[in-house]
Amino acid sequence: RRVLFRSATDGTHILWNNYYEYQFENAQHIDFFITATDLQRQTLSEQFKQYKNDCPRIRTIPVGSIESLQYPEKERKPYSIMTASRLANEKHVDWIVEAVIKAKHQLPQLSFDIYGQGEEQEKIKNIITKHRAEDYIQIKGHRNLRTIYQQYELFIAASQSEGFGLTLMEAVGSGLGMIGFDVNYGSPTFIRHHQNGYLIPIDFEQASTDDITTQIAHMIIRYFEDGPIRAHEVSYDIAESFKTSHIVDLWRQLIEEVLYD
C-alpha cells in the first residue's frame, strides 16, 4: 500500500493556511470572501479557478483607513528618511540602518529616524554605535505619528512579507516617497514602481545581507539624486482609496449586496 502525503502546493494541489482551509473548502456556503488588498483578491481568485474550478465572490476591503490626507505645514526636511514598525527581526530595520550608512557616503546630508520599539532595539543601537552614525540615525521610540510622517521625504520598509502594512498606508497618506521589497502584499499595494518610489526585486534565499543592504542603499541614492518628480503627489493619489469615507462606502455596498442577493 502506498500513502501519499502532500506537504506543499503544486500544479494540482494547493496547501492553504490552516486558519482558512475549512472556509475555502466549503466556499459554496460562503456569500463573500473579503481580502485586505487587490493582490490578495487576484491571487485567491486564481487559486480557486485553478485548483477548485470555482469562482466565489471575493471583494477587497482594506483592514485599515485614514481619516484624511496629511500635508506638511512647512517644507519637508531635505534628504530625510523614516521608518515605523515594531523593532522585530522580521521587520529588518537593521538592514535599513546598514543601507543608510552605505548611502551616506554619497549623500552626506542624509538622515534616518526610526519609530518603534522591540526586541531588536539593542542590536540596532549597536550597529549605529559601531559605525558612529548617532548624528544622523536615531531611534525615536513610540510616538503619535499623525503629525510626524509629513516632516519626512522618504519612507522605507524592509519586511520580507506584509499582510497589509498599516504604516505604509499612513506614510502614503502623508505623501512620502516609498521604498520596499517587491513581496506580497503590503509594498506592491502602496508603491508604484518609478512613480512614488521603488519596489526592490530580491531573492532572499540567494542574496547575502551585504547584497540586500547594497540594493536598498542604491535605491536611496537613486531616489534622492534622480527619483520620481511627482512622488509625493502619487502617494497622495494612492492614499485616496484608503480614506475612511471610501472604506465605509465599500462596506455599505457589500452589505446591500448581501441583503438584496
Give a label for each model feature.
Residues 68, 208-211, 225-257:
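A charged, aromatic-enriched C-terminal amphipathic alpha-helix characteristic of glycosyltransferases
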Residues 8, 28-70:
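Donor nucleotide-sugar binding/catalytic pocket of nucleotide-sugar-dependent glycosyltransferases
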Residues 125-142:
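Nucleotide-activated donor-binding/catalytic signature segment of Leloir-type glycosyltransferases, i.e.
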Residues 3-4:
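Short, small-residue-biased leader/transition segments that mark boundaries at the very start
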